[in-house]
Structure formats: structure tokens, C-alpha cells
Amino acid sequence: MSLSVNEGVDVKGLVDKVLEAYPEKSRRRRAKHLNVLEAEAKDCGVKSNIKSIPGVMTIRGCAYAGSKGVVWGPIKDMIHISHGPVGCGYYSWSGRRNYYVGDTGVDKLGTMHFTSDFQEKDIVFGGDKKLHKVIEEINELFPLVNGISIQSECPIGLNGDDIEGVSKAKSEELGKPVVPVRCEGFRGVSQSLGHHIANDVIRDWILPKKTEPKEGFVSTPYDVTIIGDYNIGGDAWASRILLEEIGLRVIAQWSGDGTLAELENQPKAKVNLIHSYRSMNYIARHMEEKFGIPWMEYNFFGPSQIAESLRKIAALFDDTIKENAEKVIAKYQPMVDAVVGDAALRAHGTKGRVPLKPLGPRHRPIVDAYHDLGMEIVGTGYEFAHNDDYQRTQHYVKEGTLIYDDVTAFELEKFVELMRPDLVASGIKEKYVFQKMGLPFRQMHSWDYSGPYHGYDGFAIFARDMDLAINNPVWGIMKAPF
């Protein structure tokens, strides 16, 4: 943590002003989730992973979203059934820009929507028979599918359906994995529990009990896996390029553009490299305990973190990999200098004050990419973080930064109104609100239909997109209401 931001601004006073709008009980509860980072603090000073206040407009998702939308959904050669009423699956269909290689309906099924379409009678009498039929139809229509997952919606956990029994029976009948995921939306306080449940299902239903390689698999000393990169806009491909450039072999990449076979390859890796810590640390820890595979978190957002991560990864291998890492960093440095120099010229000497809205696991990695462009983060937070996420956040942000956990729509709008930033980086729910307020905005849950943002090439795209947002001439025509 270095220097401070928001100098001359009474940020604590702003927090108090925003909290004044709440009734006393809600004000006391929300006050625990809002803080201003202090020098030498042991953590960010906010409570996390606690239920949202009923009635507020929260930005969180549910356990179903965490399982299907994040962990399981991008696995491309499996079919993921939204088991329950049609709405949950329909409104989350293709909601994330997980890129794939393959032919839709043949070996790429992630862009398609499958649902058991629960009706009232299914809720009253149970849906196990219907689930049997759905799985049979899927196998008949898509014979090349390598596996099926059952993503439970809320009614499944309420009416006592035996999806585990159905899964075991159909797995034996079809000779393919049929995986039950108890990710009903009412479980937990956010999508974070859905991540955890999905990780546990991979542990119990997919990972082999033994580590002997399959026939034809040739192990090397440089085998690694990419975990928790969902290939938004091609991010995982950009990360893979760098890892292969330094001499490593990526034997599994999931779940973005991932396959069932890659999941099964996981225990053969020498090191597991995890990008989205919050959503995938559970399975990484399990493999360390079960198979003795070390893991490390890496960050390929922005050149500072890319160089640091490449060196940390290379340190786990021999001198050849270490030398290659330095060569790769040096190779891309001229491009980085050009991108940063151009960004500085375009900024016209102004500070880019970015309140980075809750981005879940993405919050922490993205911060330094803004710093690399010479921008200041004046406010940031998570929507589904745990305490350890905030502990890991401290060295990324500066003293005086506004920290908010599970920020409500009202709070975020008021903070933006009072702090008047140059750019808001947030999610789709907030995009049009702030654009109508006359503020530059980037939708950072799916890179605003751009990307990739990982890697050196991704940093150039990131810098271009931030420049286009901030320096768009339309903002000279529109005026913010404040």
C-alpha cells in the first residue's frame, strides 16, 4: 500500500452521508460493509460474505449462477441441464462471453440452452421421471456429448428430488458421467457458495481416484494447468500463449474452452495455476492435499502483474524456464512502453479516477492494470468476497481508497455522484444508469463485448477501450445531472 488517494476529500464523511438515507437498523448493518482504507491496517476493515439486506437492490447472484454460469457452464463438450422452471436457464443463457473452439451441437455445446422446463405438476409430484427422460433425449439428439451436468434450481431442493440417484443410474446406463450439482439458488448468501458446491462436485464425481496417466498420455516436467480462467473474450487463450512461450505445456484449461478430458487430466499436472482465486481455490487446495500438486495464484492483467506472475511461475521450474520468462518479458516491453506512453498523452495530464465497482474475483487483479495506465482507483470492492479476499487486496490499493462490500445500487450511485470520477467500471446492471448520467463507463463483467484483457496483447486492448470510454466526444455533449 503506497501513498494515498482522495486527498482533500472527506471520504468517511461521504460514507456517513450515504448511510443517512437508511433506517437505523439497516444503517448499522451497512456501516460494517463500508470503509476507508487506512495506513498500516491489517485488513480492509469491512465485513463480507453476509446476507444482503432484504429489499435493497444488490448486485449479487445466486448459487445456481455461481455453478452453472461460472464453473460448469463453459465446459464445452458437456451439456448442462438447467433443472427446474424455464426462467433461470433462459435468462442466464449465453450471458457470459465464454469463447470456444469447435462446432456448435457437435463438440461445442456451451452456447446452447437445455432445461427440464418444470411445470406445477413436476413441483408437486417430483421431477425425477422427467429428468430421466430429459437425459435420454439429450443422449439421443447429441450422441457425441461426453457428459451431462444437472444444475439444480430452487424447486429441486424444496421438493426432495433424488438427482444423485438419477445421475448414478444414467451414468451406468449411458457409460458417460452424469453429474448432479446441488446449486439451488436459495443456498448461501451469493454465487460464492455455488462456486464451492461446483468445486466439490468436480472433486467427488470427476477427478479420478488414482493418478496413473491414461494410455497414450506422456508426462513432461513442464506440465501445468490453467484453473479459473473462463475465457471471457479469449482471455484464457491469451494466458496460454504466454505460458507456452516460456516453455510450459498446458495440459488442461478450464473451465473456459475446457473439456471433460481436461478435467480428468488435472491430477497429472506438476503445478496448478489459478486465476480466479475465489471461484476455484477449493479444488486447487483439494488437489494439493490429495495428489500433492502445488498451486499458485497468478495475474495476467496489466504488464506489472504479468511480469511478476511470469517470474513467480518460472521460479517453480528450472533455469531454462526462468531464462525464457525474462526473454518474454523483454520481448513485450517495447509494446508496453508504447501503449503506456500513448495512454499518458491521451490523458491530457488529468488523473483517471476510477471507482471500480464490485467485480467478485476480478476486482483485485484488474486494479494494477489501471495503475499501469497511470490511473487512480478511488473506490473498489467485491460482491461475493470472503474475508481472505479483502486481506489479499490491501497491497493493491492505496490509503484513502473507499472500500465497499456487496454495495447496493443506491450506495454506488451516491458514491459516484459525490466523488465525481472520470470513469466508472462496473457490470451490466449499472451500465446504462451511469451512461445516462453522462459518465464514461466500461462494463467489466464481460469486457463490454471486447477483449481479451489478459496478457500483453490484452493490455493493449484494455488501454484502447479505457481511452475510447474516457475520451469519447459524446461526453462533451452530455452533462451529468450533478
Curated annotation (Swiss-Prot):
The keyword Transferase does not apply. GO terms for cellular component: molybdenum-iron nitrogenase complex. CDD domains: Nitrogenase_MoFe_alpha. It holds the Pfam family Oxidored_nitro. One of its GO terms (biological process) is nitrogen fixation. InterPro entries: Nase/OxRdtase_comp1, Nase_comp1_asu, Nase_comp1_CS, Nase_Mo-Fe_asu. Its EC number is 1.18.6.1. [8Fe-7S] cluster binds at residues 62, 88, 154. Keywords: ATP-binding, Iron, Iron-sulfur, Metal-binding, Molybdenum, Nitrogen fixation, Nucleotide-binding, Oxidoreductase. Gene3D superfamilies: Nitrogenase molybdenum iron protein domain. One of its GO terms (molecular function) is metal ion binding. Binds 1 [8Fe-7S] cluster per heterodimer. [7Fe-Mo-9S-C-homocitryl] cluster binds at residue 445. It catalyses: N2 + 8 reduced [2Fe-2S]-[ferredoxin] + 16 ATP + 16 H2O = H2 + 8 oxidized [2Fe-2S]-[ferredoxin] + 2 NH4(+) + 16 ADP + 16 phosphate + 6 H(+). It comes from the Bacteria. PROSITE patterns: NITROGENASE_1_1, NITROGENASE_1_2. It is an enzyme of class 1 (oxidoreductase). This molybdenum-iron protein is part of the nitrogenase complex that catalyzes the key enzymatic reactions in nitrogen fixation. Belongs to the NifD/NifK/NifE/NifN family. Tetramer of two alpha and two beta chains. Forms complex with the iron protein (nitrogenase component 2). This is Nitrogenase molybdenum-iron protein alpha chain. It comes from Azospirillum brasilense. The gene is nifD.
